[in-house]
């Protein structure tokens, strides 16, 4: 049985304590996964945040650290807790109360979507779930933790920007949503400054509505310890053509914004940390 690929880790090459996370852009579907897809590959691709890994290229080229998940969200969702399992989708799992996301098919292993219905021909064996957790989910979070802890030990502060995309918004709706779990995963000034930088770049922005942040920012954000985590959601209409897969004329603009956020927020963290260290 082949191993799942490890997360792609880009080490820092600049002196700003910012780590980018891209958990939902994996496109590495194995033969076994596709063979079990009840509605074909397209049904699994609808779970992706298309090309968000490529949106991060400018920031990575500028030296920012990043962790990118090559394994598709359909296989296992790194933005869910290990316990968010739909027992109807996994064999050998005892029925237990589940959260609303797992109940609606979008738990640790997605089982159905509103558009395509049931995703899998057969239930996934519990041993396979354990394999995915051990080879995909945990290594991703270990890489995030290691990067953030290293930054915090060097600079006294660290920031995680967890990058996602959202379905096209209606005309006039914000193209960007910044999530900080209602002030629990980052200091309020961090998300406020992220919103300001996005507005200065010409985007309409909302805070925590409708996406307040998932398991990644909830797990890794510890603002009381100087480790901040925000979720960045960009509307797909801002960087993709109408087919939802092809980069549009706005692609480079969004890539530039991610670099701007990393630079501006990273410098702001250092500016705040230095006076505190001198006291």
Please give the residue ranges for each predicted region.
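N-terminal catalytic or cofactor-binding beta/alpha core of small enzyme domains
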Residues: 1-160, 166-230, 234-279
């Amino acid at each position: 049985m082949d191993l799942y690929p490890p997360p792609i880790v880009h080490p820092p090459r600049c002196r700003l304590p910012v780590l980018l996370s891209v958990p939902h852009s994996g496109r590495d579907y194995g033969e076994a996964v596709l063979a079990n897809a009840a509605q074909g590959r397209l049904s699994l691709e609808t779970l992706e945040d298309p090309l968000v890994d490529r949106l991060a290229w400018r920031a990575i080229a500028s030296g920012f650290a990043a962790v990118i998940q090559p394994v598709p969200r359909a296989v296992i969702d790194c933005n869910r807790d290990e316990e968010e399992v739909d027992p109807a989708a996994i064999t050998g799992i005892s029925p237990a109360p589940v959260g609303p996301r797992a109940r609606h098919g979008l738990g640790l292993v997605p089982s159905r979507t509103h558009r395509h219905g049931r995703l899998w021909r057969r239930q996934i064996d519990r041993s396979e779930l354990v394999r995915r957790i051990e080879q995909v989910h945990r290594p991703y979070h270990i890489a995030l933790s290691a990067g953030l802890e290293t930054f915090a030990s060097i600079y006294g502060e660290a920031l995680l920007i967890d990058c996602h995309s959202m379905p096209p918004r209606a005309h006039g709706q914000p193209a960007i949503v910044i999530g900080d779990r209602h002030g629990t995963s980052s200091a309020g000034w961090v998300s406020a400054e992220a919103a300001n930088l996005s507005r200065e770049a010409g985007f309409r922005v909302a805070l925590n509505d409708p996406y307040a942040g998932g398991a990644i920012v909830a797990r890794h954000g510890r603002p009381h310890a100087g480790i901040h985590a925000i979720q960045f959601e960009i509307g797909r209409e801002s960087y993709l053509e109408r087919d939802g897969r092809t980069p549009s004329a706005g692609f480079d603009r969004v890539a530039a914004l991610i670099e701007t956020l990393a630079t501006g927020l990273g410098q702001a963290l250092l500016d705040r940390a230095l006076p505190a260290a001198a006291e």
